Amino acid sequence: MNKLKLIFAGTPDFAARHLAALLSSDHEVVAVYTQPDKPAGRGQKLTASPVKELALAHNLPVYQPASLRKEEAQAELAALGADLMVVVAYGLILPKAVLDTPRLGCINVHGSLLPRWRGAAPIQRSIWAGDAETGVTIMQMDVGLDTGAMIRKVSCPIAADETSASLYDKLAGLGPQALVDTVNAMAAGNTAAEAQDDAQANYAEKLSKEEARIDWSMEAVAIERCTRAFNPWPISWFEVAGQTVKVWQAEVVAQDHGQAAGTLLKADKQGIDIATGKGVLRLLTLQPPGKKAMSVTDLLNSRRDWFEPGTQLN
């Protein structure tokens, strides 16, 4: 097997786990690209990405262009003489000039079984849609958005209690080995890519805070999936007594209620039951303003007046 010279491009922890796998492989990472440092935390201090921190710990050259569209940035990348560029949650668009620069092109690790859930939020959208399985796809990049030919797929089930946080960890465990296997196969000239069927594609749009507002007219099953899809961000929420309350955990209670959607049916140590468009949603772990997430029992000890039966939410 030939030893390949790699450029790695990525930004969050998910990407850093893939970089770590490449650093333990037989190949040479000659440079790392990541997004510019950004303000974070209460002090809004400029903070390096997890990928940058890992790269610096391994004394790798780090490049942080605001864009790869400029000729200077493209020339700088070409001068690295890489055989292959590996892209994982980088966050910048790669123009055709960059895609064509490495001898073997650019490959991308995507958190879904393409062509399902192209786009920015595949993990969250797969949970929200009630998919039974998802996985990781490694594709040869082209100028489209997650439209490239697929080199390798690894699947995993989505558990009934899966959150975006837990599924993120699952895929971050699956992806690195699949990536190393793919790079090894490319080094040996032993890969075949399968074109995506555009007719089977759908799009995983980026999440918004407003989208996380609970619509009680939806079915309880769908709302419960939302609470898991939006955990750990932006967290599903509703308003009561003029306050915003976040929902970290809920469950579906299979019962008919005969009440208007959004009606509070009961509140006790078992949970807070809310009528929905179909079925009942039982709220289990909530976060009131300025507090940490807490059990319903703890919240009712201090705010029972918010949750009187018959109260209409939203």
From Swiss-Prot:
It comes from Aeromonas hydrophila subsp. hydrophila (strain ATCC 7966 / DSM 30187 / BCRC 13018 / CCUG 14551 / JCM 1027 / KCTC 2358 / NCIMB 9240 / NCTC 8049). (6S)-5,6,7,8-tetrahydrofolate binds at residues 112-115. The lineage of its organism: Bacteria, Pseudomonadati, Pseudomonadota, Gammaproteobacteria, Aeromonadales. Its EC number is 2.1.2.9. InterPro entries: Fmt, Formyl_trans_C, Formyl_trans_C_sf, Formyl_transf_N, Formyl_transf_N_sf, Formyl_transferase-like_C_sf, GART_AS, Met-tRNA-FMT_C. It catalyses: L-methionyl-tRNA(fMet) + (6R)-10-formyltetrahydrofolate = N-formyl-L-methionyl-tRNA(fMet) + (6S)-5,6,7,8-tetrahydrofolate + H(+). The gene is fmt. Keywords: Protein biosynthesis, Transferase. This is Methionyl-tRNA formyltransferase. GO terms for cellular component: cytosol.
